[in-house]
Amino acid sequence: MHISNSQFWKRILKRCNGLKLVNLQTYLKPYRINLFIARNRAQITILQEDKLLEVEMLHPKMDNLCWLHKVAPGFPINGSKITIIHEPVHFYGTLLEMCKFAKRRITFASLYLGTGKLESELVQTIEHAILSSNGNIKARFLLDYMRGSRGVQNSRKMLEPLLKGKYAHCSEVFLYHTPKLRGLLKVIMPDRFNEVIGLQHMKLYMIDDTLIISGANLSNDYFTNRQDRYFIIEDAKELCDFYDDLVKRVGEFSFVLQSDGSTKLNSTLSSHPCEGPKQEFSEEAAHRIKTLFQNEIQKRIELNKQKEALDADTWIFPLVQMGQLNILHDSEVTLKLLQSASLGARLKLATGYFNLTSDYISAVLKHCQATCDLLTAHPTANGFFSAKGIASSIPAAYTKIEESFYKTCERLGQQERVTLWEFIKPGWTYHAKGLWYYLPGQQRPCLTLVGSPNFGYRSVNRDLETQIAIVTKNEKLQMALQEEQERLFMYAKLVTKRTFSQEDRIPPAWIRTTIVLFRYFF
């Protein structure tokens, strides 16, 4: 369903359950934001007061991006401080090297931490860094409770050494437990499948004032042959402070790992995620996130008046999605980006698991006017391809969803404007997700989304997610974004009608009959 600008602002306000985005008039009108200010004028609806404000823009073709300042905190940065790396091994090496020389903080948020040799070396490096700093480094981890507790040797066991010894007080491990997994459902659902109910999925890696944001988890595959995206943002203290605070806020309504391997619910929380009233927990947790977000927007308004902010050539906007807590922020912003892409623009969208929500499908096929290329994993590059049991059929289920989308494109006459591609690279799996936005007539993207969301039902409704929107006029950064996109699509194979008639691409009958249920959990 297409929504107008005024409907968009009201929808975000409603879905954020009372989150008020402050009036930007005192911020935008007297000051020229280099990224968005230009000779032309545009009328922009103010969310809080639902009235128009005149704002000058940087580039007439970027008018439809300035609204990001009104729905998320904006962090100015020089584009030269952003580095894109391409290989999992470089991601791991960067984490290791930066942890080795950390001075103040190491804050990691991930689905889980693996249990192999590489993961052990990472934990040992962090432990040694804390020791070398004489306890001046604060190490903080946020993982998913169920995924991090799976098996005898698990993430919790891996991190226990940090909670013992002379500097045990320097480390803390938070384990988020979804309020939706409780009672009989929690008892009967196998460990391998309980994560479909909902989990902590954010991927944030902060060392001092550097943020590495990615879709990659902390495990062997993601360090070796599982393709993802990795952005290193240096000298970004304020951005790191915000995300560090976000991790701490989620930690406030999570379990805390103890030195003996047990867990205790954070003492700052008055309600229990899986034993107390679900609504009470969800409302209390959501309030803490919304308060943080609102306060950050207010703070950015004042700080962004300074000359350093006005001279920035790049802006970063954090987007948060916590559907199980009724915080639908990232999905609304993403939907607006898709719907507002104009004729002549180009969008490149990637997801490790192709399962677009009905809103996203409608936006791409019915309202978006841009040329769209969608990249996802070929079945052999799907992370579940070599799985055992029922999980081995998951790639076939995604094939069925792809086929349904392809047929919808044909039925609506959009198969020329919207093209589907599959990543296939021998020996590799594919996990990259995000978006590259090209203005009409431009050869390089000026905006990208990078982070944890997959644009599917899980990301929107079940998991804790975050990604950042990077808007830039820095030519070198735009070139780096273009190179990143080309490297991923270099291994892409075009999807055609014949793709789905190949013998190895025809899903079993039981998949075809259960796909409606499947798509709401994966």
Predicted regions and their residues:
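Structural motif
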Residues: L111, A350-Y353
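Cysteine/selenocysteine-centered motifs that mediate thiol-based redox chemistry or coordinate metal-sulfur cofactors
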Residues: Y243-P277, Q478-F522
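Short, solvent-exposed amphipathic alpha-helical segments in soluble enzyme
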Residues: S362-H367, E465
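N-terminal mitochondrial targeting presequence
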Residues: M1-M57, M62
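C-terminal soluble interaction/assembly domains
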Residues: T448-V450, I468-I470
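Extended hydrophobic-aromatic, low-complexity segments
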Residues: S358-I361, D373-L375, G383-S386, A432, ...
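Structural beta-sheet core signal
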Residues: F141, I213, L349, L374-T376, ...
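HKD-type phospholipase D/PLD-like phosphodiesterase module
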Residues: R41-Q43, L47-D50, E56, P60-F101, ...
